[in-house]
C-alpha cells in the first residue's frame, strides 16, 4: 500500500506547523475576532460604523522570496506580505480589520512555516489587524524542496462618505512622500540579476540581509494623519515606481511633478545604479526611497511633515499637482 507520506505529503509535519502557527496568530487577535484558528472559516465582527464599506486587497512577495531562500531567513517576508496588502487598502482611507495568508511549498518544514507566519503576525500587529485564518499547502513535485510561496488577503473598513478616491484633488495641491525602508517588495527580479553575491558586505552587513529589510507598513502614521487633515489622495509606491503608482490616485487629468532632489535617495538604490541600472529605469522600477505618497492642501504640507517626524517617520515635500494627463514629470 502506498501512503500519503510516500507521495510526499507529511501530515504529522502539517499538524506540527499548525500548532506553531496558532501561537503566533493568537498574538494578533483584536476585539472583533469571534473564533480561534482551526474552524472552517474565520469570523470577524464589523465595528460600529454608520455606513461601512469593506475594502479589500491581495498580493504576494514575488521573487524577494528567492533572497530569503538563499539567506535562509524566513521571518521577514511575512511582514512584506501583510504590508503589500494593507498599504494598498490604506490608500482609500480604510482601516485594516483582518488578514488571511496562503503558503505553498514542495516539502513542508514546520519550523520554516512558523517563521513565515511569525512575520505575518508581526505585520498584522504593526497594522493593527487580526490574522484570522490561512492555508498551508504541501505540493510535492510542484515546488522544489526548500522553496515556498506566500500570498495574503486583507480586508479593511471605511465610512462610505470618508472614502478617499482622488475626486477632491486640485491643481496646486502638494505631494508629501513618506520614506521607504528600501526596495520593499518590488524590483527583485532585476536585483537578483545584478546582485550575484548576497553575502558581500554592504553598509556593515551582508547585502542579502539589507535586501530582506521588510516593507514599511504605513497604517499607524497615516491613520493618525487622517484624523487631523484633509488628505485628498494616497499612493502606495510599488512596482513601476512613481510613474506607475502616483497617477492611480488621480480621478481627473493631473500631472504629478516630482523633484528628485527633494529627499535623500537611500544608498541601496545608488548601489544598484552603480551595478549598471540606468537612472530612468530605476525610477520606472523602484520606489527610490519613497514608499507612500499623500496629496494634500499646500497649507497642510509642512504641518504633516512635522507630525510625521514626531511619529518617527521621515516625510518630505516631494512635489505638486498640476493640470495634465495622468502622468508623472520628474525634475
Curated annotation (Swiss-Prot):
SUPFAM superfamilies (alphabetical): PurM C-terminal domain-like, PurM N-terminal domain-like
Record-level Gene Ontology MF annotations: ATP binding; phosphoribosylamine-glycine ligase activity; phosphoribosylformylglycinamidine cyclo-ligase activity
One Gene Ontology CC term in the entry: cytosol
UniProt KW Cytoplasm keyword: yes
Top-level taxon: Bacteria
Catalytic activity: 2-formamido-N(1)-(5-O-phospho-beta-D-ribosyl)acetamidine + ATP = 5-amino-1-(5-phospho-beta-D-ribosyl)imidazole + ADP + phosphate + H(+)
EC number: 6.3.3.1
Pfam family, one: AIRS_C
Keyword ATP-binding attributed: yes
UniProtKB keywords: ATP-binding, Cytoplasm, Ligase, Nucleotide-binding, Purine biosynthesis
InterPro entries from the UniProt entry: PurM-like_C_dom, PurM-like_C_sf, PurM-like_N, PurM-like_N_sf, PurM_cligase
Any single biological process term in GO: 'de novo' IMP biosynthetic process
Entry's localization field: Cytoplasm
CDD domains: PurM
Pathway it works in: Purine metabolism; IMP biosynthesis via de novo pathway; 5-amino-1-(5-phospho-D-ribosyl)imidazole from N(2)-formyl-N(1)-(5-phospho-D-ribosyl)glycinamide: step 2/2
Family: Belongs to the AIR synthase family.
Name of the featured protein: Phosphoribosylformylglycinamidine cyclo-ligase
Protein source organism: Clostridium botulinum (strain 657 / Type Ba4)
Gene from which this protein is expressed: purM
